[in-house]
């Protein structure tokens, strides 16, 4: 019986692959899309066939009820614990219950607020301490620059001293020791400048297939290109909207959280109150619409050096589709470009 069941299953797989091949051939002959788009759609179609997926299928509501109750029961059994991936920032995790699968999380701030440092800290915490696989797409910094930042941050080393070669022997030992730890962590870095959304999506799919994937981080969204590079300069808002929608769709397809860094418009600098608002998101209202969570980073000491709130960064949760909005505070160690729980510093 098992032998015949195996034959039936294999025939079904072959039929799925044949249908995928027919669809791909039709796309090539139609000529409606450019080559990168056809490659992206072809890869997705083959992966669907290989994993027995069919995106057009309806699901009986009874099945949805059962899976939803199972999810609620999992939360109940956690007794208030985290249901997502921990960032290791306690107050933030308590607010979000961790990074949730299929969520698109936007982290936005003006320059010099620590966006890259914040997400590098999250990447290290998730990969080293939670043992989860992280894909980091760095469009602004090279992989070596990014790794130097992570090494100094995790080893509590002054990044400026590392840049100018003034580390002591003891600091060198700490750097090497941390290098051994980070070198074993499941972090994968891609530093393709101006990467297209199709290419990013393809790389993320392959990484998930080959090594597993739990979290994607993109630094930063406005440096990405849409799928149609020929007309990318015509309407930047429409291009950002396409990228935003595609990232949300990718988060759902791979069932992983995606953290995308974003710039804020200069209008923040032109008003008396500098704290960011949702209307400050640069280039497209679709960013606010597509994101499940919007976080703003704000440091009062950046604008007011005399403030008593030195080294305090506010993480403002301005949108939270499935939870409360609030503000949590972290301690920012500038010399290490590292964030820590505020309670740890008190």
Q: Predicted regions: what is each one?
A:
Residues 92, 219, 292:
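Non-catalytic, usually N-terminal nucleic-acid engagement modules in DNA/RNA processing proteins
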Residues 125, 129-212, 226, 328-331:
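Cytosolic-facing regulatory segments adjacent to core modules
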Residues 56-157, 176-177, 184, 345-346:
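The Walker A/P-loop phosphate-binding site
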Residues 140-141, 260-265:
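A short beta-strand-to-loop transition that corresponds to the Sensor-1 phosphate-sensing loop
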Residues 159-168, 188-194, 225-241, 268-279:
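Flexible beta-alpha connector loops of hexameric P-loop NTPases
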Residues 1-78, 82, 113, 132, ...:
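Short, small/acidic-rich helices and loops at N termini and domain boundaries
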Residues 213-260:
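Helical hairpin unit composed of two closely spaced alpha helices linked by a short loop
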Residues 198-213, 245-255, 266-346:
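C-terminal regions of RecA-like/P-loop NTPase motor modules
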């Amino acid at each position: 019986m098992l032998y015949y069941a195996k034959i039936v299953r294999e025939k079904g797989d072959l039929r799925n692959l044949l249908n995928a091949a027919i669809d791909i051939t039709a796309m090539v002959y139609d000529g409606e899309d450019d080559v990168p788009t056809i490659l992206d759609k072809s890869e997705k179609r083959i992966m669907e066939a290989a994993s027995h997926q069919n995106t057009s299928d309806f699901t009986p509501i009874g099945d949805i009820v059962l899976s939803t109750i199972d999810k609620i029961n999992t939360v109940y059994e956690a007794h208030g614990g985290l249901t997502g991936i921990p960032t290791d920032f306690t107050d933030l995790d308590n607010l979000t219950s961790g990074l949730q699968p299929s969520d698109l999380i936007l982290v936005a701030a003006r320059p010099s607020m620590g966006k890259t440092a914040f997400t590098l800290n999250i990447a290290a915490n998730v990969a080293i301490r939670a043992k989860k696989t992280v894909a980091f797409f760095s469009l602004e910094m090279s992989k070596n620059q990014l790794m130097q930042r992570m090494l100094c941050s995790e080893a509590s080393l002054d990044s400026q001293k590392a840049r100018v070669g003034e580390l002591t022997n003891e600091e060198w030992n700490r750097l090497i020791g941390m290098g051994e730890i980070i070198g074993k962590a499941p972090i994968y870095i891609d530093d393709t400048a101006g990467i297209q959304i199709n290419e990013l999506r393809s790389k993320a799919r392959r990484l998930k297939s080959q090594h597993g994937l739990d979290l994607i981080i993109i630094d930063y969204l406005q440096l990405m290109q849409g799928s149609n590079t020929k007309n990318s300069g015509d309407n930047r808002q429409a291009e950002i909207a396409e990228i935003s929608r595609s990232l949300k769709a990718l988060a759902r397809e791979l069932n992983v959280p995606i953290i995308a860094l974003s710039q804020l418009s200069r209008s923040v600098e032109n008003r008396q109150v500098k704290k960011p608002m949702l209307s400050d998101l640069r280039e497209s209202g679709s960013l606010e619409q597509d994101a499940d969570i919007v976080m703003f980073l704000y440091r009062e000491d950046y604008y007011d050096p005399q403030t008593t709130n030195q080294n305090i960064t506010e993480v403002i949760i301005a949108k939270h589709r499935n939870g409360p909005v609030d503000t949590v505070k972290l301690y920012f160690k500038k010399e290490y470009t590292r964030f820590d729980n505020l309670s740890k510093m008190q």
